[in-house]
Amino acid sequence: ARTQPENVFVHCVDQDKSLTYGALYALSNRFAGFLKERGLGANDRVLLLAENSVENLAVFAATLRYGATLATVHVEMNQAHLAEIVAAIAPRIVLYQEGLGLEEVIEGAEGEAVPLGDWNADGGSTGLFAEIEKFSEEDTIESCAGPDDFGVIFYTSGTVAKPKGVIQTHATAWYNYDATADYLGIGPGDRVFDCRSYSWLSAQHMSFGAPLVSGATCIMAKHFSRSRYFGWLKDYDINVGFVVPTIVNMLLNQPVPVSARDLPHLRFLTSSSAPLLEEQWRAFEGLYGIKLAQSAGSSEGGNSAAHRGADRKIGTIGPALKYQDIFVIDGEGNRLKQGETGEIIFAGGRQQAYGYLMPDGSIERLPVDGHHSGDIGFIDADGHLHITGRVKELIIRGGMNIAPLEIDSVLVRHPAVAEAGTIGVPHPIYGEEVVAYVACLDGLSPSTAEMLNHCRSALPE
């Protein structure tokens, strides 16, 4: 903020609104006055219920600057458990976006409810941003927190069971932001683009925290749009864009007339949040000529491994990030050698989350010696991580461990197949039998025999 106050920190394409580092500095100091007046201190929680917006990221940064704890919840994905989540967080302040149907939840919350409102650089701000205008924009209030105090709480979808919050300390958050900026290779003047929710860890690290600590610019959209995605990358001279495998599939299944030549500023797109099949990867690069990289991590372990764009090794996740120690263990907990397959452990002490915020409001500490990812994989001779499946998804057929992802990757090589999914079902003799489902491209319908023969050509009987 002091060295580049006029540089843009975040711009939202839907709002057509930008927030500079200088304006963020002023807003953060005003927000610090707002929180201090209400007596908030370290580990007191500010709950943010909002969609992607300039205001969202302004509050995120401002809360961390003051030293309180910011709790984020994806309203739509956690709708069934929202009241329980709010009760577990026990926020001192609830900042909410109007128009999301949150009235009942807000009424049941213990903390002070304040509409988020709109920030306008030229005046006429509303909600919170009108409320904080009476406070000084100068840096007169010191942070109330230390590095080991809680900085961020975020939630998973909660579609299977009651969701748990994941707690990062202020130090943990910073180390993740710094490691992410390092592997992305971004700094002042660089622009990244994201359209994923900032209620999720991945977007928080990659396109909020990494630009914040490096002085880069985040260009955001509220949602993904297949027809507008490449236009955004072109219009805003994006250097690095963030995708997930679903976006890659959508851009493959319904191609857009664009190529790398149309995007001269774009260095690469990086995919995360789920494994990217090698076939998807090669097909995307072949179709568009745009480099794809991949990264992996977890809510508990933070960003863990990633390619540095051009040094990508297709079919792998990439090497460990600078604060991470990644290793693989067998069923007895013994470390395995390079090339040997087992469960992947992320032992990034400085990037590892503190613990879980449980549904009853209690805190469950995470082990300090590493996070069991639940992923199966190995590390190759170049130090690149490979993920081959999930421990819980393993199909055990007649005593043989079969990774569904291995079968999926073969199925999608068939020219008629768009997507594939493999599961295990009970079998009276083998214990489990393999069953696979495929979604075919429009107008194509290969026979069962054809698909079985295709699999036999690449898989053992």
Per-range role (PLM):
Residues 9-53, 57-61, 78-83, 87, ...:
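Conserved AMP-binding/adenylate-forming core of the ANL superfamily
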Residues 5-8, 118-120, 134-155, 162, ...:
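Conserved pre-ATP/AMP-binding loop-to-beta segment of ANL
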Residues 174-191, 199-240, 254:
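Conserved AMP-binding/adenylation subdomain of ANL enzymes
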Residues 77, 94-96, 233, 241, ...:
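AMP-binding/adenylate-forming catalytic core of the ANL superfamily
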Residues 18-22, 144, 151-175:
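Conserved AMP-binding A3 loop
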Residues 319-323, 334-364, 402:
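Conserved ATP/PPi-binding loop(s) of AMP-dependent carboxylate-activating enzymes
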Residues 99-147, 254-255:
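ANL superfamily adenylate-forming
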Residues 213, 238-243, 254-314, 322-325, ...:
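Gly/Ser/Thr-rich phosphate-binding loop
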